Amino acid sequence: MAQHLLHGTLHATIYEVDALHGGGVRQGFLGKILANVEETIGVGKGETQLYATIDLQKARVGRTRKIKNEPKNPKWYESFHIYCAHLASDIIFTVKDDNPIGATLIGRAYIPVDQVINGEEVDQWVEILDNDRNPIQGGSKIHVKLQYFHVEEDRNWNMGIKSAKFPGVPYTFFSQRQGCKVSLYQDAHIPDNFVPRIPLAGGKNYEPQRCWEDIFDAISNAKHLIYITGWSVYAEIALVRDSRRPKPGGDVTIGELLKKKASEGVRVLLLVWDDRTSVDVLKKDGLMATHDEETENFFRGSDVHCILCPRNPDDGGSIVQSLQISTMFTHHQKIVVVDSEMPSRGGSEMRRIVSFVGGIDLCDGRYDTPFHSLFRTLDTVHHDDFHQPNFTGAAITKGGPREPWHDIHSRLEGPIAWDVMYNFEQRWSKQGGKDILVKLRDLSDIIITPSPVMFQEDHDVWNVQLFRSIDGGAAAGFPESPEAAAEAGLVSGKDNIIDRSIQDAYIHAIRRAKDFIYVENQYFLGSSFAWAADGITPEDINALHLIPKELSLKIVSKIEKGEKFRVYVVVPMWPEGLPESGSVQAILDWQRRTMEMMYKDVIQALRAQGLEEDPRNYLTFFCLGNREVKKDGEYEPAEKPDPDTDYMRAQEARRFMIYVHTKMMIVDDEYIIIGSANINQRSMDGARDSEIAMGGYQPHHLSHRQPARGQIHGFRMSLWYEHLGMLDETFLDPSSLECIEKVNRISDKYWDFYSSESLEHDLPGHLLRYPIGVASEGDITELPGFEFFPDTKARILGTKSDYLPPILTT
């Protein structure tokens, strides 16, 4: 049957199944083994646990809760609001019986996409069929209702944010908040000599903010509470390191600062991810070197409450799923919540809540500036914070290059800050143990209730919304029933309740976009349902989030209308780690497949319009790198790296990637998302890694009638100044052909400088073309002469792993 593109929203309801007879049949040898295992360990006998799923072709897009002990007539009555961007011939409803090891297939019902594509409501009983498409015993049927809304029926499609009345992303746990203030941070620190002149509306110039200085001040000035969550928190790092900007008390480590505040009576609570691999004797640092046990030991016996927090599964999953979640997934939110003085109320005792959200963990290797030096800070700010996990045996005693760190963070003030605190309270209540959260009700005469910090008339005011990827295994207070969950903007699964609003926020922002999108992210992979079956079975990958496909479909829709639209994506050269290792190569392989899927969409759309244009004028990928000539008086290491290693080659060539750890998207210079979530399935799933993000805009700086010139525009221009080493008039309009051609041209030139044999000057900027080619049909190819990243034997296009399960690397 012909496949149709379903791009929009599918409203689906699964009511009930009538007249089921007997269980389903397990297939083949494995089925017999599972039956024997169940009999031996005494599980899976007796009760039925029936649930239903919705698939668009082979992509799972919804699932009901389990109904226990209703073997004949299970009634779910569950409704789903499904974002779709899938080619499909059928919408498939599958009924299964769950058990601790896996699930038994009862049967499947099919509704052809032809029936829903025109938008009419379909409400019918559909026959349930077996694997051979014959009716199952007893002729059972499932009652479902479907209605499809094409993306162009959405009144926000292609419109951007039309006015200050824009209500935010619908169907989410947290509503959009008005009257907020946001500070945007590029990198952990900005030195005084980073001063791009970027004009904003109202005759102002953009002023960069300093993240770790502000966090230091916020912690230092807290009087009642300091709440911190992190993937990693390392007690031994210093937040203040710029000798030209000293602060009173700034020479302490964050661990000592938190102990001091706790001893003064401030409630200091830390939730740090418990890396389950870190107990393994063979992995003294854990796979990811998070220092979780060192941090716990540092605070033991002090007034600081530090909880190591495993990523526990929500209750009720199969044994296999539970093992996957607790050993493979992480707590990834990076937040700081403090009480703070009231702005401009001299002498007032009243306090408010201020929160920080973004990509920067308070740990080693994160302190950096937009200059991202490889060698020149090794005797100063990075001497005791030398981070280089991409080479075996790298150490300060052997010298650079260190791994520079590019990241983005935000400070939130106003009602939105309380939402971040509520997220912490939900997580602490679930996994923190003792009930020692500060009872704000008892402090109501000191800490104000959530209230605006700015009037809506103020030209600097923000509207902000909080988004998460999290489930009931990590947050308390989620409703039990699917109806209540849907009401609260949550998604109900087979055995868990999920907040997946970060993915929703990205989808919404992409669909609204008018002119351009600028993405910086540590990972870029997904929409595996649309990947080519080149050596893989796409439905086995399960990296099902929509973001890459939504981006390519947005470009396609603009090409079809003859309108301009550009997408710029910055990723790291490779994911942190040994670049030739199996996991890094597997992720690069998924990234290549994602890029290829997108470029094929773009090229097909151009061909359909009779255009033979360079697809990089619509969609373009970059990475960041630095290269420095040797200067007199530079740090001289006592030892050398081993000969003929990546480390030695990089040291001799004086170059290395700048690690892009950011998780940010800017749309039309008017809307920004900043958080902890990567563009991969782990971060976007909701039931894998736990994440948090903000999405916001300034209602007085929309790109409705003229280009937006508020803080978001200033922030993007400041980032481009950091990456390109220059400002240019063409950068003011990223949607123009002149702009994308110029940025591509500069990044091509910088890649040539970066990868050349000899080096006469420092690299003039950091933005490098991502070193791939795009063939005439959209296939991703090697750039001539670049099978491997410079100084390595690691393939740029990646290598499919035959032993690592996709759930680990997607």
UniProtKB/Swiss-Prot annotation:
Ways its activity is controlled: Not inhibited by neomycin.
The reaction(s) this protein catalyses: a 1,2-diacyl-sn-glycero-3-phosphocholine + H2O = a 1,2-diacyl-sn-glycero-3-phosphate + choline + H(+)
Annotated positions binding a 1,2-diacyl-sn-glycero-3-phosphate: H332, Q522, H661
Signal peptide: none
Expression by tissue: Highly expressed in roots, stems and flowers, moderately in leaves, seedlings and siliques. Not detected in seeds.
pH dependence: Optimum pH is 4.5 to 5.0 in the presence of micromolar levels of Ca(2+) and PIP2. Optimum pH is 5.5 to 6.5 in the presence of millimolar levels of Ca(2+).
Subunit structure: Interacts with GPA1. This binding inhibits PLDALPHA1 activity and is relieved by GTP.
Summary of the function given for this chain in its UniProt record: Hydrolyzes glycerol-phospholipids at the terminal phosphodiesteric bond to generate phosphatidic acids (PA). Plays an important role in various cellular processes, including phytohormone action and response to stress, characterized by acidification of the cell. Involved in wound induction of jasmonic acid. May be involved in membrane lipid remodeling. Probably involved in freezing tolerance by modulating the cold-responsive genes and accumulation of osmolytes.
Name used for this protein in its record: Phospholipase D alpha 1
Primary gene name: PLDALPHA1
